[in-house]
A protein has these predicted regions:
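Membrane-embedded multi-pass helical conduit in multi-pass membrane proteins
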Residues: 105, 154-210
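Catalytic donor/gating beta->alpha subdomain of glycosyltransferases that bind UDP-sugars
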Residues: 10-41, 76-80, 84-150, 208
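Conserved nucleotide-sugar donor-binding
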Residues: 57-72, 93
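Short, well-ordered alpha-helical scaffold segment located
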Residues: 68-70, 102, 152
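Loop-to-transmembrane-helix entry motif
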Residues: 48, 52, 151, 155-159
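Short alpha-helix within the catalytic core of nucleotide-sugar-dependent glycosyltransferases
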Residues: 1-11
Length: 210
């Protein structure tokens, strides 16, 4: 059924890639709660990107492309489920979202495994941002807007967070002190959530920062 939902989008000759909806984890598990919140956010973003022009990347668990548009990747490429769809978009085709096609992954990795996965994704984000900077061309229209807001800003966000932390420590104003307290609460919650997960404890409100 999911495959039928995917391929129906290819009746539009402008569509070169279709991504399905990805659902992950046990909602009763701490990691699943945090991941569920993250994927709900990602789903909203992808819906809007698809309406604007094209989504950035695809869910590796379930997506389809036109065979004629595939371009081989190098051995050093990370996150092929992002690069393959983006190269199709580069060729002038759309990459769209099909929420009626659903892929479920019920098991969530350990905290250590999840951290390793996200570290790999972050490394891929850096690689892809550099490799696809040409997508920022104004000639790309909505794709350029999506690429800047969804990929470039996300890649450099850790640098902004470090700069914010440093400026909050050295800033003499009440606003800087308030920002420092909020950051300490956020990072502290993530650390406590990590420790709770290692001990097998579930604390729902700690799932988001983790």
């Amino acid at each position: 059924q999911a495959l039928r939902q995917l391929v129906r989008n290819f009746t539009d000759p402008r569509v070169g890639c279709v991504s399905g909806l990805y659902r992950l984890g046990d909602p009763h598990d701490l990691r699943g709660q945090g991941e569920g919140l993250y994927w709900r956010y990602e789903t909203f973003i992808k819906r809007q990107e698809s309406r604007l022009h094209s989504i950035l990347g695809a869910h590796g668990a379930l997506y389809a492309i036109r065979k004629s548009l595939f371009q081989p990747l190098t051995e050093t490429s990370i996150n092929d489920d992002y690069l393959i769809p983006m190269r199709i978009v580069e060729q002038g085709y759309r990459s769209v979202y099909e929420p009626a096609a659903v892929a479920w992954e019920r098991e969530v990795a350990s905290v250590e495994g999840e951290f390793a996965r996200r570290r790999r994704i972050a490394a891929g984000n850096c690689q892809q941002t550099v490799e696809l900077l040409r997508m920022l061309s104004p000639l790309r229209g909505g794709v350029a807007v999506s690429f800047f807001s969804h990929k470039v800003l996300r890649t450099v966000a850790p640098l902004f967070m470090v700069a914010l932390l440093i400026s909050s420590v050295w800033g003499p104003t009440p606003w800087a002190a308030a920002a420092l307290i909020l950051q300490a609460m956020l990072y502290g919650s993530a650390a406590v959530g990590y420790l709770c997960q290692r001990r097998g404890w579930t604390v729902r409100w700690l799932s988001a920062p983790l």
